[in-house]
From Swiss-Prot:
GO MF annotations, alphabetized: rRNA binding; structural constituent of ribosome
GO biological process terms held by the UniProt record: ribosomal large subunit assembly; translation
GO CC terms, sorted: ribonucleoprotein complex; ribosome
Domain of life: Bacteria
Gene: rplT
Keywords in alphabetical order: Ribonucleoprotein, Ribosomal protein, RNA-binding, rRNA-binding
Transmembrane segments: none
Keyword Lyase carried by entry: no
Protein name: Large ribosomal subunit protein bL20
Protein family according to the UniProt entry: Belongs to the bacterial ribosomal protein bL20 family.
Function (record text): Binds directly to 23S ribosomal RNA and is necessary for the in vitro assembly process of the 50S ribosomal subunit. It is not involved in the protein synthesizing functions of that subunit.
InterPro entries given in the database record: Ribosomal_bL20, RIBOSOMAL_L20_CS, Ribosomal_protein_bL20_C
Coiled-coil parts of chain: none
Gene3D superfamilies: 6.10.160.10, Ribosomal protein L20
């Protein structure tokens, strides 16, 4: 039976790990064992924070909408209720963008939502 040598594959795996931890500090960037642990932990953080990012952006959008709406004298929840009643189907991302970039247009949307509530 032929002898199996795995030098090429293990070298490739090690290069892949070291490339992933490039920019780390100390032995995390040079020693395979420590670098592998650092890479796995970084991947865990990345996985977790890809989900956290969605929550954080949604809360940011809500804060921006709420700030714009309260300047018009209405609460966020009443504004969203008014939007659904008058049939305006804009998501929070777009509403926050409008409130941030063009307050005049946002003011008209708020007035339509208020008229739907009355």
């Amino acid at each position: 039976m032929a002898r199996v040598k795995r030098g090429v594959t293990s070298h490739a795996k090690h290069k892949k790990v070291l490339k992933a931890v490039k920019g780390q500090w100390g032995r995390r960037k040079s020693t395979i064992r420590v670098a592998k642990q650092a890479m796995e932990k970084a991947m865990q953080y990345a996985y977790r924070d890809r989900r956290t990012k969605k929550r954080e952006f949604k809360s940011l959008w809500i804060q921006r909408i709420n700030a714009g709406v309260r300047s018009e004298g209405i609460t966020y929840s009443k504004f969203i209720n008014g939007l659904t009643k008058c049939g305006i189907k804009l998501d929070r991302k777009i509403l926050a963008e409008i409130a941030y970039d063009s307050p005049e247009a946002f003011k008209t949307i708020v007035q339509k939502a208020q008229s739907a509530l009355n």
